[in-house]
């Protein structure tokens, strides 16, 4: 998940230079100025660690406009809500932002689906669905991210039975390199649909998405403090199954998990069974931020207060608009069966990053059949790192983390920082070659390719 930890520390403590060079972590091409004049000011991502390689950005307000922009361009790349930490959405030539394609197209109660434009944000969609009595199966920790961008990178929430956000997709519409509008559906397009959903922006510009919905539901959120790390060895599955969505937060110090966030469904007529202690962790006495020292007013309500799904499943409130946050993020997915071994390997590194790590979050995600999803064919545990913008130190630590997780076939989050090579990715994704072929099918001349795809899908 490309999540926002709303840090409230001094600018001196958080200061870090922007990183115009980050790809997965490689150099990008020389930026190309728009034709006919001086280059426009360039956008940055929301964390401020990355400046995009061109100020040549177009903002279609209709599918027809998107088609026209794509047909006119020699090279172009789709840009979502700018929440990625690497250059997956970058291009030195031209960017096409879907921020103005942000409406609900149709709600179909009979099929239990909602069709939306690509740039709508999950928080906005959540409010709409709740007003109609419907819900999505899960949300990421930050509700401000766009639907199409989140799907393209397999962004996720938590829950042992919950797939990532892309698993809710039943149909997708995108503009191809030829300017044609293609619609693929789970019902009609089978394997090709499964390859296209987590498309990494390589098949075209997503314009509409159809998502499965369900009746609205209520959730309560309870937080526990100070879970002994050793309890994870025998009780990891029980702990992560103690709610509909469970997250662990730790800085890997003192063999301690500082917080356990348990989000539980409220079933009408069935009293909630909330534990007075959770394998040695005790209930928090107040609302908490994932970093316990920080103020919690931007976090979703805790202390067991019932609320609608879209106000409890995220960690942070929709009505707080995030500003640029001085942080870096990386995340790796390992098989659920290797959970404790992987966590133990990382826990042993804790002393290496005392000065560089804000917090880590551990979540679970159900297996899926989407080709480029990090959870393809395996129930997974996601180990996330929110780093300080100590760029030089962090970029040395990331390969150390990857080395420890390599025995478990760790797959990186596509929108966060990693140095795993294309050869390693190829060995860890069964459908890697099939996806390369799918890219060539829809984009034979590489109109949507960029350095990120060239590096990681060589």
Walk through the language-model features, giving the residues of each.
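Activity-critical C-terminal alpha-helical subdomain
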Residues: 408-458
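C-terminal segment of N-terminal export signals and the immediately downstream linker at the start
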Residues: 21-68
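Short glycine/threonine-rich loop-to-helix capping motif typified by GTGT followed
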Residues: 17-20, 260-265, 303, 307, ...
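Glycine-rich N-terminal segment of FAD-binding domains in flavoprotein oxidoreductases
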Residues: 48-140, 154-159, 248, 362
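Substrate-recognition/cap regions that form aromatic- and gly/pro-loop-enriched pockets
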Residues: 313, 317-424
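N-terminal secretory signal peptides and thylakoid transit peptides that target proteins
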Residues: 1-20, 24-28
